[in-house]
Curated annotation (Swiss-Prot):
It catalyses: fluoride(in) = fluoride(out). It is a multi-pass membrane protein. Belongs to the fluoride channel Fluc/FEX (TC 1.A.43) family. The chain crosses the membrane at residues 4-24, 37-57, 67-87, 98-118. Its main location: membrane. This is Fluoride-specific ion channel FluC 1. Na(+) is not transported, but it plays an essential structural role and its presence is essential for fluoride channel function. GO terms for molecular function: fluoride channel activity; metal ion binding. Na(+) binds at G77, T80. GO terms for cellular component: plasma membrane. The lineage of its organism: Bacteria, Bacillati, Bacillota, Bacilli, Bacillales. The gene is fluC1.
Length: 137
């Protein structure tokens, strides 16, 4: 049965990477500036989703742990991209876009922490609400 986790992570990873790719293309259709908005928005969304998933969905026990791992490690792990963030930052620095690079790094780190905090807070709130409504885990 442990082979199922590899399949779940693999399939979810493919879906996460494709989602990032197509969402990035869509954002680039409307955003034609130096600032790497697509990667920032995708990474911030991933921070929120992973925190919410691990704080709420995983604790409800409504999905098998292999599915939770598939979503977290596979989908969200391949949807977000630290390597693209790093390369884009170096490219900005190499093109002497110091201000944009600083803004990008700041928004990525602080925004990631804020979005993770919001995902955690929402997950915790929903979990407590779920428990107080009489549905116990």
């Amino acid at each position: 049965m442990r082979k199922l986790i590899y399949i779940m992570v693999g399939i979810a990873g493919i879906l996460g990477a494709l989602s990032r790719y197509y969402l990035g293309l869509t954002i680039h259709e409307f955003w034609h500036h130096t600032f790497p908005l697509a990667t920032l928005l995708i990474n911030l969304a991933g921070c929120f989703l992973l925190a919410w998933l691990t704080t709420y969905i995983a604790k409800l026990n409504i999905l098998p742990s292999d599915v939770i791992t598939g979503i977290g490690t596979g989908f969200i792990g391949s949807f977000t991209t630290f390597s693209t963030f790093s390369v884009e930052t170096i490219q900005l620095i190499n093109h002497f876009e110091w201000g944009i690079a600083f803004l990008y790094v700041s928004c990525s780190i602080l925004g990631g922490l804020i979005m993770s905090g919001l995902g955690y807070t929402l997950g915790d709130f929903l979990l407590k609400k779920h428990l107080t409504e009489g549905d116990h885990l």
